[in-house]
Amino acid sequence: MGLPWYRVHTVVLNDPGRLIAVHLMHTALVAGWAGSMALYELAVFDPSDPVLNPMWRQGMFVMPFMARLGVTDSWGGWSITGESVSNPGLWSLEGVALTHIVLSGMLFLAAIWHWVYWDLELFRDPRTGEPALDLPKIFGIHLLLSSLLCFGFGAFHVTGLFGPGMWVSDGYGVTGKVLPVAPAWGPEGFNPFNPGGVASHHIAAGTVGILAGVFHLTVRPPQRLYRALRMGNIETVLSSSISAVFFSAFITCGTMWYGSATTPIELFGPTRYQWDSGYFQQEIEKRVENAIADGAAPSEAWSRIPDKLAFYDYIGNNPAKGGLFRAGPMNKGDGVAEAWLGHPVFQDKEGRELSVRRMPAFFETFPVILVDKDGIIRADIPFRRAESKYSIEQVGVTASFYGGKLNGQVFNDAPSVKKYARKAQLGEVFEFDRTTLESDGVFRSSPRGWFTFGHANFALIFFFGHLWHGSRTIFRDVFAGIGAEVTEQVEFGAFQKLGDRSSKKQGAV
């Protein structure tokens, strides 16, 4: 037909069999990619340290989505939570990946069958014998089936009635595991961080959708509405489908970037706002203060802080710190975290306790400044030593460690104090292995950042696609023009293929 690359989809217009074929092939590609990507991630994933080397530090993209649905165990005998497992069966990471690949193969064969056997009786109007699709009826069927799935997911999978539940954790991402979730039917169900809302909203949306599906199967649209919305044109379906997809993409951008019950920090990493607001820092300090109030010594109080919680309070885990053009997982940046060194507390020779001012998210470099409890600058690492008044050496700063690997150690020499002051600027202090992965020391973003960036871009592109195809279908008669030689009343947009022979035309005299 000599079509340019951007017009090739013309071949499936008015060809229901091949329209089904290309959709089957598309679903085959999606399922095949999901299964193959999962197997690739499982091949490169290191499950040995779920606390300091979790999946989001390793750049896993598919695995977090599997885990939040309750797939956490591997045929290799390990679990994402760090436990040993035996015989996880089909409901395992490898099992789900392989079922997607098998599904992909079956869809591939179905696509070929429908491409070859495209001219089925099913696709012909029994009154006219012409190829035709009853699009409002098809809409009702799709709505009913998808709503049944939606209802089933909320009522059975998430609640644990017939399924594993979903990933549930505390507000600080320390105790997460897969649990059955009871639906939340009150105002608390609208809290985006409440897993109960996932169950209740899927049940509610599924119920409404089932009723709407039955309605669209039993009630025909009025003729004026049918014509006004071009319900007989397949491009109307394309336009409205694109709108549903871009709207969903925008919503998931928000739930991913700002965080929600469906994007737990144990699986996708912390959000940038948790660093900006000092979310984990405040919780750690609160726990330490409570422990000291109960009679614990500072070193004991800090030793009670889980490494997992301390690791969240580190700027390298902030998804906004990685540049969009720095490819690779977080571990390729600052390295593989090996140990929490502890919490450094600095003191000047006057006995004042000092803390290092933390680096804001959008700074690559930031002055190392030590302030007292009143926020007054008492020490720094100067840019120009000749003019310094508050240098570590001049002020006589020492560093004492509480908790972690260096618990109880005190550093008096200026080089060591400076080293730990620079590290404290980035949050809690950790030891990293940068040799194994040849990490370059430049921060990378987490899968949370990549997901948001990708979906925001695609949502924007699909938004314009919706406008384009919506305009084409609504204004088809305007764009096409009404030719004087057409002697038959036709629905514009119904015959758009090159070489169309079905519209009666009067030859030029």
Swiss-Prot record:
Cofactor note: Binds multiple chlorophylls. PSII binds additional chlorophylls, carotenoids and specific lipids.
Gene3D superfamilies xref list: Photosystem II CP47 reaction center protein
Keyword Disulfide bond tagged: no
Localization: Plastid, Chloroplast thylakoid membrane
One GO cellular component, as annotated: photosystem II
Transmembrane domains' residue ranges: 21-36, 101-115, 140-156, 203-218, 237-252, 457-472
Main subcellular localisation: plastid
GO molecular function terms attached to this record: chlorophyll binding; electron transporter, transferring electrons within the cyclic electron transport pathway of photosynthesis activity
Subunit structure: PSII is composed of 1 copy each of membrane proteins PsbA, PsbB, PsbC, PsbD, PsbE, PsbF, PsbH, PsbI, PsbJ, PsbK, PsbL, PsbM, PsbT, PsbX, PsbY, PsbZ, Psb30/Ycf12, at least 3 peripheral proteins of the oxygen-evolving complex and a large number of cofactors. It forms dimeric complexes.
Family from the record: Belongs to the PsbB/PsbC family. PsbB subfamily.
Protein name in UniProt: Photosystem II CP47 reaction center protein
Source species of the chain: Porphyra purpurea
